[in-house]
Structure formats: C-alpha cells, structure tokens
Amino acid sequence: MNEQGEAINNSAESRIQLESSWKAHVGNWLLRPEMRDLSAFLRARKVAGVSVYPPGSQIFAAFEATPFQRVKAVILGQDPYHGQGQAHGLCFSVRPGMPLPPSLLNIYKELEEDLGLLRPDHGCLLPWAKRGVLLLNAVLTVEDGRAGAHQGKGWEGFTDHVVDTLNREREGLVFMLWGSYAQAKGKVIDTRRHLVLKAAHPSPLSAHRGFLGCRHFSLCNQYLSQHGLGMVDWSLPPCIALDGAILNGRIAV
C-alpha cells in the first residue's frame, strides 16, 4: 500500500495514523465508507504514477503538531500547495528552504503591521502549530500542479467534523476565517462560545479587500487573554534555529 493510502487505511482502527487525542475525538470518522473510498482513490492515483502531496506521513501533521486540548486558535485553509516540496500538512505553511508563496508573504506583512514582528527567512509555520494554532486545510491532499484536484473526494466531510467537534467540545477558541471558502466552512461555529474573525483571503488577488489591516493576530490574543487560555506567541525563529527534524522535512513535536 502506498504512503497516502496507508495514512487513512481503515481496515482496523488501530492503524489510523492520527495523534491520540484527535483519534479519541474524531477517529471514528475515518472508519466511514466514504473514507475507505478516499483511501482507494489515493492508492489508485499513486498506482497511476501521480505525485500526491504532502507525503502520507504528513497528511495529518496539523493534528500531530496541535493535540486536541492544546488548540487555542484555528486557521482554515482550502487545500495544500501543489508544487513539489512545498506542502507538509499545515495550511499556508511551506517547508524551510522553499520560496514564500504570495499568500504567506501577505500573512507576514499583516503580522508585521499588527504586532511589529519582522518577516522570518522561511515559510514554516510549525512553531505556531506547536503553540496551539491548528493549521487546518479543508482538503488534506492535492496532486502535483493541480490545485483543488482532491476536492469532493471525501476530505471535506472529515474536516467539517473536526471543526464541528471543536465547536461543540471546546470553548473560548478563536477561528480565523480568511476568504469565502473558509467562512462557509465555519458557519457551524457558535459565536456565543468562540470568537470568529473574518477577513478576505491573503491572496494578492484579495488581500487589499480587508485582509491587510484586519489585526487578527492581536485580536486573537486579546480574546485568549480575556478567556484564560494564554496568548499565542506569533513570532517565528530564524531558519537556522528551527529543529533539525523540521529542516529534514519531518514534522517533529
């Protein structure tokens, strides 16, 4: 079985490669028939010689980096970057050494304007994830050079369930919804229990329509401080200070 298919193989619950706290809360969803179909689809694409990103061991990296009870904030993306070597399981993030995508450049621009934090020399957002920011794409796999290739194949139901579970079982979280796609996915969120921050997508095509200047990073910390969860440290270390395992392309927590 190829790596992508193995990551969601549902022949036995014990084989699901999902961080233990998340497995307890949402793992049963991966046993559903539609997820079995998704696993078969991923295997078939691999057999056909198609490059699927991220590698199977990193499909669930967002959950590995941010266990269920450690989540403070959620940033929702759409699907992984579709260039070779970019995606590593965290939305908007790229592996160290990869060029910064335009949307991430705008995220860094807003971060500097909002909090005075200078742009780092890399695009790896794993430090945010390890500090409680769930960097969740709606679709967890993509094909080389084909943005959106795996939309409608089954991932959306699983990630909808993740968002709904956080909404119901946690309280006082911050959901940062950038763009209409993320905002539609976040409609289930109870704004009496959580803070929902909405803005345009950070893409260069839309960032000037409300993302730049949204101050979501400081608003997030203000809310978290008021609700006793502790603020997020949004700073990112220089590339040279990142964990060696990260530099080698492996999510380490």
Swiss-Prot record:
Gene3D superfamilies: Uracil-DNA glycosylase-like domain. It is an enzyme of class 3 (hydrolase). It is found in: Cytoplasm. GO terms for cellular component: cytoplasm. Disulfide bonds: none annotated. GO terms for molecular function: uracil DNA N-glycosylase activity. The keyword Transmembrane does not apply. It holds the Pfam family UDG. Keywords: Cytoplasm, DNA damage, DNA repair, Hydrolase. InterPro entries: UDG_fam1, Ura-DNA_Glyclase_AS, Uracil-DNA_glycosylase-like, Uracil-DNA_glycosylase-like_sf. Its main location: cytoplasm. GO terms for biological process: base-excision repair, AP site formation via deaminated base removal. SMART domains: UDG (SM00986), UreE_C (SM00987). Its EC number is 3.2.2.27. The active site is at residue 79. It catalyses: Hydrolyzes single-stranded DNA or mismatched double-stranded DNA and polynucleotides, releasing free uracil. Excises uracil residues from the DNA which can arise as a result of misincorporation of dUMP residues by DNA polymerase or due to deamination of cytosine. Belongs to the uracil-DNA glycosylase (UDG) superfamily. UNG family. This is Uracil-DNA glycosylase. It comes from Xylella fastidiosa (strain 9a5c). The gene is ung.
